Design a protein with these regions (language model features):
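A general secondary-structure boundary signal
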Residues: 43-47, 633, 651-653
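Low-complexity, Pro/Thr/Ser/Gly/Ala-rich linker/spacer regions in secreted
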Residues: 2-3, 652-655
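Catalytic domains of carbohydrate-active enzymes that cleave complex glycans
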Residues: 204-639, 644-649
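Short, surface-exposed, polar/charged, turn-prone segments marking secondary-structure boundaries
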Residues: 76-77, 650-652
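Carbohydrate-recognition beta-sandwich/jelly-roll modules
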Residues: 1-343, 347-348
Length: 655
């Protein structure tokens, strides 16, 4: 379906254009350019190289024009029958971020699906990149009505000045026929499948980097540093940020947060159980005391996030409450067999249920437990995925199937919405997927591929759209691939959210129905994180950027083309627990120690929502992934040799 076209019309307008068999040439006063079209993975790479001897100003929009408009149906039937996914993702006020730059449009007039992907490392010419561009549908009425899909400036002035030199403009597109529009969720699945082959899967290896088990041991040592702790009103807890590490004074708060205590304590309990490390005992008890400082604010069935607090401190950012009080707290209660913490969780769940029902499961970004009503104007409906996760945990702790009914309603409600209404914290989507897979395991056995599995796949795919798929030319000191935008529109990755997104993947990939997921793609992202997440720690960033003690507590922020700060916000103690999650997920088993270091062994025994039981398997399992473009022979737990195909996975078991 490919026909040569001018991708940069703003440049062509000031050029003399010549069409040849396999390329388009343009010349002007002191500049020349060439556009080439190359078939690849069922689509076409479109590459334009501009060479200019002087500053050149034009609109760099790159658009695939799909058809003309009659000014009759274009604002009604024409658009009503389109299916559109824009990029990057946005927050619930519509402000865009800088994650996956891929979009798709179904055109009912020509019955075509068009998909475009603008690789994030091909924007050296755009200083602020996605601060000033988005990828979406476009309608133009001058000089003649037409519509298309592509990269568009979002700033008030669409004109950009290009300095003397060479500039490369590059994107990939694919068009296929389709008799009917897909739902946005189905279109998203097609988009992810189409662009997966474009991902460069080889990770960047850091020479002499320690394994994540060694990182966890160093983090455990750092967590004993006084700079991590604060004592106030007779209670001691972990600060949100290491004292002395924040340029903007986030480390000076005279309080501590439940989020921080729960973030560290839960994975620390699991890590201690796996490793038998007795030197974690004192820290565990100290954190348990801090968690017990949080009591239900009566009569509101609410657990606050900050200590100290009063009975009027009922205003909340909803995802804090649903993640910490309704997911991590019950886990801590289960692992410590603490009946009081279990009661606190079940009481808090009553409050979470009241807000869910009052909002018809379309949860707000902010709320107040004083009346369990929304506050302000924004939604965060993805929090319903966390609510469903809390309900799944409550069911396992009580046996009450009413909790599963609540989880079903919550997930079914948000899945009726278009995907763009669910983007906020990316890990919300992982919890939603884990809850959906749990519901599948309790569905009728004859339904091999239930709607719950497909729903879980959809939530995972949406989280992948919040991921970073390519290197960022503005930050050569680290590789952002495999990380996730910390929150919709924030435009930087954070270690906490990175690991919390993939925490659920161990359980998802280790349970029946995992074949519905993009397994190799998840493995590639997990492998990227295994290799690239070191960038959040002092020993692996430039010395000039380091600040404060505790080198093995992660910084919150790393720079991108859009967000220009690294290690400015401080070392986030509420993300330190993710080092222990990383050790659980990535600690290389013995059989992998003689395999190439770029190969992944992801543990499939790290739980997310499935509480451990007496029936938990004794055999360890791993997902092995080969990121290379050629097959590689590897060792297995049984000492057999396995030939692993390029970019493929294999599940292996060991004693």
């Amino acid at each position: 379906m490919h026909k040569p076209f001018v991708p940069l019309e703003g440049l062509a307008e000031i050029s003399r254009v010549t069409y040849e068999a396999d390329r388009i040439l343009g010349t002007g006063d002191g500049f020349a350019w060439e556009t080439r079209f190359t078939a690849h993975e069922g689509g076409i790479w479109v590459e334009t190289t501009l060479q200019t001897e002087k500053a050149l100003t034009f609109n760099p929009a790159m658009i695939i024009w799909l058809g003309t408009l009659d000014n009759l149906n274009d604002r009604q039937a024409h658009t009503w029958r389109q299916t559109i996914l824009r990029a990057p993702t946005t927050n619930q006020q519509g402000l865009g971020g800088n994650d996956l730059p891929a979009a798709t449009l179904y055109d009912p007039d020509h019955r075509t699906h068009t998909l475009v992907y603008f690789p994030p490392d091909a924007f050296q010419w755009a200083v602020h990149r996605f601060y000033e561009f988005s990828i979406r549908e476009v309608t133009e009425y001058r000089p003649a009505p037409r519509y298309g899909l592509g990269l568009l400036p979002t700033s008030p002035s669409p004109l950009f000045t290009f300095q003397p030199g060479t500039h490369l403009f590059r994107f990939w597109y694919k068009q296929t026929l389709g008799d009917a529009p897909l739902s946005q969720w189905a279109a998203q699945n097609s988009l992810i499948n189409a662009i997966t082959p474009l991902l460069e899967t080889q990770p960047t290896l850091i020479p002499d980097s320690p394994g994540w088990e060694a990182m966890a041991q160093n983090t455990l040592k750092d967590l004993h540093d006084d700079a991590c702790w604060i004592t106030i009103q007779g209670k001691t807890g972990l600060r949100a940020y290491v004292r002395g590490s924040s340029e903007v004074k986030r480390d000076e708060a005279q309080s501590f947060e439940l989020m921080t205590q729960a973030d560290v304590l839960l994975p620390l309990l699991l890590w201690r159980k796996k490793t038998g490390r007795k030197d974690a005992d004192n820290l565990v008890e100290k954190l348990l005391d801090a968690v017990r400082a949080y009591q239900i604010i009566e009569p509101h069935s609410y657990v606050p996030n900050h200590y100290p607090y009063t009975n009027t401190d009922t205003f909340m950012d909803t995802w804090y409450f649903y993640e910490n009080a309704l997911i991590k707290l019950p886990w801590i209660a289960a692992l410590t067999d603490d009946a009081d913490l279990k009661r606190t969780f079940l009481t808090a769940l009553e409050g979470g249920r009241e807000l869910a029902r009052k909002t018809h499961y379309l949860l707000p970004l902010f709320a107040d437990a004083n009346d369990w009503d929304p506050r302000h104007s924004s939604l965060n409906v993805g929090v319903s995925g966390m609510y469903a996760a809390g309900c799944v945990l409550a069911y396992q702790m009580t046996g009450d199937t009413a909790h599963l009914d609540e989880a079903k309603i919550a997930l079914s409600t948000i899945h009726q919405l278009p995907p763009h209404m669910l983007t906020h914290e990316p890990q919300q989507l992982s919890f939603a997927a884990a809850a959906a897979f749990f519901l599948h395991s309790h569905a009728a056995p004859e339904n091999a591929v239930s709607n719950w599995l497909l729903m879980g796949r959809d939530f995972v795919n949406l989280s992948l759209r919040m991921g970073y798929w390519g290197k960022d030319p503005a930050v050569p000191f680290y590789d952002v691939r495999g990380m996730f935008q910390a929150c919709a529109s924030l435009c930087y990755p954070a270690y906490k959210e990175n690991v919390e997104v993939i925490w659920a993947w161990s359980e998802l990939l280790g349970t029946p129905g995992y074949e519905t997921l993009p397994v190799s793609l998840l493995a590639a992202f997990a492998n990227f994180q295994r290799c690239h997440n070191y960038a959040f720690f002092d020993p692996f960033i430039p010395a000039s950027m380091r600040r404060g003690p505790c080198p093995y507590i992660p910084y919150e922020d790393l720079a991108t083309s859009e967000f220009t700060h690294t290690a400015t916000l401080g070392k986030e103690l509420y993300g330190a627990g993710e080092v222990f999650w990383s050790a659980l997920l990535f600690d290389a088993p013995d059989f992998m120690r003689h395999n190439p270091p770029d190969l992944l062994a992801l543990s499939l025994d790290v739980p997310c929502l499935r509480l451990p039981t007496l029936n938990t398997p004794n055999k360890s399992r791993w997902l092995i992934y080969n990121p290379r473009g050629e097959a590689v022979e590897i060792n297995t737990p049984t000492q057999d040799r396995l030939l692993l195909a390029p970019k493929s996975t294999q599940i292996v078991e060991g004693a």
